[in-house]
UniProtKB/Swiss-Prot annotation:
Binding residues annotated for heme, in chain numbering: C443
Any single biological process term in GO: xenobiotic metabolic process
Any single GO CC term annotated in Swiss-Prot or TrEMBL for this entry: cytoplasm
Protein task: A cytochrome P450 monooxygenase involved in the metabolism of fatty acids, steroids and retinoids. Mechanistically, uses molecular oxygen inserting one oxygen atom into a substrate, and reducing the second into a water molecule, with two electrons provided by NADPH via cytochrome P450 reductase (NADPH--hemoprotein reductase). Catalyzes the epoxidation of double bonds of polyunsaturated fatty acids (PUFA).
Coiled-coil parts of chain: none
Name of the protein: Cytochrome P450 2D6
Keywords assigned: Cholesterol metabolism, Endoplasmic reticulum, Fatty acid metabolism, Heme, Iron, Lipid metabolism, Membrane, Metal-binding, Microsome, Monooxygenase, Oxidoreductase, Steroid metabolism, Sterol metabolism
SUPFAM superfamilies: Cytochrome P450 (SSF48264)
Reaction catalysed by this enzyme: (5Z,8Z,11Z,14Z)-eicosatetraenoate + reduced [NADPH--hemoprotein reductase] + O2 = (8R,9S)-epoxy-(5Z,11Z,14Z)-eicosatrienoate + oxidized [NADPH--hemoprotein reductase] + H2O + H(+); (5Z,8Z,11Z,14Z)-eicosatetraenoate + reduced [NADPH--hemoprotein reductase] + O2 = (11R,12S)-epoxy-(5Z,8Z,14Z)-eicosatrienoate + oxidized [NADPH--hemoprotein reductase] + H2O + H(+); (5Z,8Z,11Z,14Z)-eicosatetraenoate + reduced [NADPH--hemoprotein reductase] + O2 = (14S,15R)-epoxy-(5Z,8Z,11Z)-eicosatrienoate + oxidized [NADPH--hemoprotein reductase] + H2O + H(+); N-(5Z,8Z,11Z,14Z-eicosatetraenoyl)-ethanolamine + reduced [NADPH--hemoprotein reductase] + O2 = N-(8,9-epoxy-5Z,11Z,14Z-eicosatrienoyl)-ethanolamine + oxidized [NADPH--hemoprotein reductase] + H2O + H(+)
Enzyme Commission number: 1.14.14.-
PANTHER family in the cross-refs: CYTOCHROME P450 2D6-RELATED, CYTOCHROME P450 508A4-RELATED
A matching Pfam family: p450
UniProt gene name: CYP2D6
Length: 497
């Protein structure tokens, strides 16, 4: 084919792509559609968003366009919601209409399918309802909200304190030990076992979970989701989700071993056995979400979300204690008054410890570890803050804009536990405290996370005083964004009390 013949073909292809682009952006001209930066043909606003620091980028766009603004990522329409009023109106008032998740094409690489979507990224429908109901009821049956699970956590807290004591007051980074302790709680719930902190396979699993979570953000990921045809290019597809694939491979080995010890005649000892029991009941039902593929994804959901979020919050907590020794001393005084230095903390103590409870909540607010939550999608046309948002629009809920709203919090960008105390020193929780999101897709692990945060945090401060190592500079209180916001690397000294 000569060059002359290629020119008309190129013109036709260009016109076709421009028409497709025009069709996808025509909703921007509809009445009351949220404002936003002008999208480029084909790419939309992909080049306008800094995916390495999305929260900051969204904050700048909010200043230009207001609390409800629009983007177009290639041909995917997106609306970003900022501030308590907009977020609550979308997720609570229109809860049924915003409970869906947008398609995430790259998850096909991990084996996602119509009946194997796990819980967190599952589309809103029968499969999600089935798995949400199963997860909540199984966690409850395994002891969530009861003494049995509380004892698991307090036992693990004792192991964590012993590991801290091994450093004999010398400087160390606490993150790895926090990951191991929180992971063992999840391992007990999902696989009925805990690991020694130096177990090589356990360490490999944790490393992959950490690296896999970083793959939840980034420019290439967003481009491949926005233009999924690019997934057919092996060189591109092979660059994403490498750690998540390796994590699932490791998890498959654990699940295979666990199946060999499962006795169907006995009551389930953990979530995996409960899932296997449901698979037996669902045999012959092609519509069931209880299948081998979904087992690994459900367990992976609980592992990845349940481990890193809680351990990151604890890492923020210890950082803020060494940066604010006056707050640390007040927490320790309350622990001494209510619990003493011998008895292990219990959830029943929390009601008598308003200051410690306020500090933990302020750690969550200030750390702001999941600033953008998880994306939602509208299942029908809705109206938010006077703007019309069409069916099929992806929603980003900027939780950071709620947790650090100047209209709600006295000192939004400072660590200030008094945000959660009234004039009489009683604990209060403002409506704008939404670290677990809100609505039908709010985090199902919230009760477990609250238990872990209280028991691990109080156990550590009961046994140790934490400080900045002598001769080292004061650590930064600024975080690092990679889907989660983690503290900048720091060391501390844990001196036994």
């Amino acid at each position: 084919m000569g060059l002359e013949a290629l020119v008309p073909l190129a013109v036709i292809v260009t016109i076709f792509l421009l028409l497709v682009d025009l069709m996808h952006r025509r909703q921007r001209w509809a009445a009351r559609y949220p404002p936003g930066p002008l999208p480029l043909p084909g790419l939309g606003n992909l080049l306008h968003v800094d995916f390495q620091n999305t929260p900051y980028c969204f904050d700048q766009l909010r200043r230009r366009f207001g609390d409800v603004f629009s983007l177009q990522l290639a041909w995917t329409p997106v609306v970003v919601l900022n501030g308590l009023a907009a977020v609550r109106e979308a997720l609570v008032t229109h809860g049924e209409d915003t409970a869906d998740r947008p398609p995430v094409p790259i998850t096909q690489i991990l084996g996602f399918g119509p009946r194997s979507q796990g819980v967190f990224l599952a589309r809103y429908g029968p499969a999600w309802r089935e798995q949400r109901r199963f997860s909540v009821s199984t966690l409850r049956n395994l002891g969530l909200g009861k003494k049995s699970l509380e004892q698991w956590v307090t036992e693990e807290a004792a192991c964590l304190c012993a590991a801290f004591a091994n450093h004999s007051g010398r400087p160390f980074r606490p993150n790895g030990l926090l990951d191991k302790a929180v992971s063992n709680v999840i391992a007990s719930l999902t696989c009925g076992r805990r690991f020694e902190y130096d177990d090589p396979r356990f360490l490999r699993l944790l490393d992959l979970a950490q690296e896999g979570l970083k793959e939840e953000s980034g420019f290439l990921r967003e481009v491949l989701n926005a233009i999924p045809v690019l997934l057919h290019i092996p060189a591109l597809a092979g660059k994403v989700l490498r750690f998540q694939k390796a994590f699932l491979t490791q998890l498959d080995e654990l699940l295979t071993e666990h199946r060999m010890t499962w006795d169907p005649a006995q009551p389930p000892r953990d979530l995996t056995e409960a899932f296997l029991a449901e698979m037996e009941k669902a045999k012959g039902n092609p519509e069931s979400s209880f299948n081998d593929e979904n087992l690994r994804i459900v367990v992976a959901d609980l592992f990845s979300a349940g481990i890193v979020t809680t351990s990151t919050t604890l890492a923020w907590g210890l950082l803020l204690m060494i940066l604010h020794p006056d707050v640390q001393r007040r927490v320790q005084q309350e622990i001494d008054d209510v619990i003493g230095q011998v008895r292990r903390p219990e959830m029943g103590d929390q009601a008598r410890m308003p200051y410690t409870t306020a500090v933990i909540h302020e750690v969550q607010r200030f750390g702001d570890i999941v600033p953008l939550g998880v994306t939602h999608m509208t299942s029908r046309d809705i109206e938010v803050q006077g703007f019309r948002i069409p069916k099929g629009t992806t929603l980003f809920t900027n939780l950071s804009s709620v947790l650090k709203d100047k209209a709600v919090w006295e000192k939004p960008f400072r660590f200030h536990p008094e945000h959660f105390l009234d004039a009489q020193g009683h604990f209060v929780k403002p409506e704008a405290f939404l670290p677990f999101s809100a609505g039908r897709r709010a985090c199902l692990g919230e009760p477990l996370a609250r238990m872990e945060l209280f028991l691990f945090f109080t156990s550590l401060l009961q046994h140790f005083s934490f400080s900045v190592p002598t001769g080292q500079p004061r650590p930064s209180h600024h975080g690092v964004f990679a889907f989660l916001v983690t503290p900048s690397p720091y060391e501390l000294c844990a001196v036994p009390r």
